[in-house]
Design a protein with these regions (language model features):
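Membrane-interface helix-loop junction between the first two transmembrane segments
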Residues: 13, 22-39
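Short, strongly hydrophobic alpha-helical membrane anchors
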Residues: 1-8
Length: 124
């Protein structure tokens, strides 16, 4: 049942990535003995700005649906995707600093993706 008050899946995913980023960030700070309130506040501000950015996207979608603006695109989904990608990169960076062995496991895959983007032939 889809309610007016239901949270769209893209928002749930963006929020989940934000939570995982906070958790891995705290783990990294504890491991490196760098836990401090200033950095935590900056992280909270960043997450709050992402949430406001997502809300802005839904407001823009609403405006495009009800006011003829001459253009239409899925602003909220685009913004959620941007947030998810940004948070995923941050999570991977945090995990790499928490456990450097993970970098060794993921590096060949990332290198192959990079080569594929550059149009190089990848041997299997």
């Amino acid at each position: 049942m889809n309610s007016v008050y239901s949270v769209p899946v893209e928002v749930k995913l963006a929020l989940a990535f934000m939570v995982i980023d906070v958790f891995t960030g705290v783990l990294k700070a504890v491991k490196n003995k760098e836990l401090n309130s200033t950095k935590a506040r900056e992280g909270i501000y960043k997450k709050a700005s992402f949430i406001l950015f997502i809300a802005f996207g839904y407001l823009a979608d609403y405006a495009m649906a009800y006011v003829h603006m001459g253009f239409n695109f899925p602003a909220a989904v685009t913004i959620c995707t941007l947030v998810i990608v940004t948070e995923a990169i941050s999570v991977l960076e945090n995990l790499g600093q928490i456990n450097p062995d993970l970098v060794k496991l993921v590096a060949p895959f990332l290198s192959a993706l990079n080569k594929k983007e550059e149009g190089e032939h990848i041997e299997h």
